[in-house]
Every structure is written in C-alpha cells, then in structure tokens.
Amino acid sequence: MQKAQADMNEVLLTIPNIPTDEVPEGRDASSNVVVKEGGVKPDLPEGSLCHWDLLKKFNLVDFDLGVKITGAGFPVYIGKMARFQRALEAFFLDEARKSGYTEVQPPLVVNEASGLGTGQLPDKEGQMYHANLDNLYLIPTAEVPVTNLFRDEIIEENELPIKCCAYSACFRREAGSYGKDVRGLNRLHQFDKVETLSLIHISEPTR
C-alpha cells in the first residue's frame, strides 16, 4: 500500500496546476499576450549604448569581478548602483506594505519538501543550486519559502485574504540560456527581487 501511495504521489507531481480561463494557450513565448502597459517607451537615437555598456562606462556594475570571485552571472554592484538597488528594494517593500501586505524575511535555502510544495521539484531541479551535504536548495524566488509558510496548514475562509511580501536574493542556474538574452543584467544566476503573494478565495478575481 505504501509503495502504491508513493507511486501515485510521483505521478501527481508531474501534473501542473490548472491555469485560469483567461490564460491563453500556447507552446512558447510567442503566444504571450500583453495584459497591461504603462508609460511611453522612448525611441532611442542611433548610437545609443546598451545597458551593459552604460554600466561599464560609469563603473556601476563589474561583471569581470563577479567572474573572478564566483563565475559568470554573478555581477558586483558598485557605488551608486549598489545604493540604487538597496533603495529600490526598500521602495517596493514599503509600497507593498501600504497596500496591505505583511513583510516577511524568509530563509534563502529550503528543504526538499518546500521545493516540492511549490512545484520547483522535481520539474526544475536542474535549475536550482543544491547543497548536497545538507540536501537544501538555494531559493529561485521568495515565493518558495513564503508559500511554504502555509504548507500543511488549514486556513479558515474568514482569514482570507492573506497578503505577504518579501525581499530576497534569488539563485537560478539558468541552464540552457544563451545568446542576446543573457547579456548584462539579463538571466543572472543571482539577483535581488521583491515578491508579493496573496492567498485569496477562489471566487475572488485575480489581479
């Protein structure tokens, strides 16, 4: 019986979540639909520098130092850029808090059960950094530990919605990424992000 249960759980882990009706069907990124746009996208004049050239020109980010210390995809933020990044993190956390989110500071490593709880495992195991000695995983997003705060918990309807926000460093192997989409600050192995997460009743509209 235990083997049958284990076999069934292994199969269930391969079944994805059911998307909402408004999610378009598609095989790749070309099927994505723009839901909302804001502001005006400027037309850059001929000869404009790419962001990675600007970062190097003004000594804001040093990619070579990151390679020296760790490897590609781990940039070193310097001076004004380091302060700007810190200010952005505080700004987004403060704005989320004003909108009713409770700030939490989760661990940056999770156990296997947490990875399974949010679907990173087993599907994306090859994209995660794994500390074999302790069988722990560096988080790819704060969504993983924050969601698992509520794993195996029964939440009463009158407790909803539950809104959390969290800042964290994020770690992704990005195996298979290459070309123009990995230049500069694109497709990094380590980056910072503010995550918002809401637990809502199924009858509430998604936002």
For every predicted segment, state its role.
Residues 1-42, 60, 64:
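N-terminal alpha-helical targeting/anchoring segments
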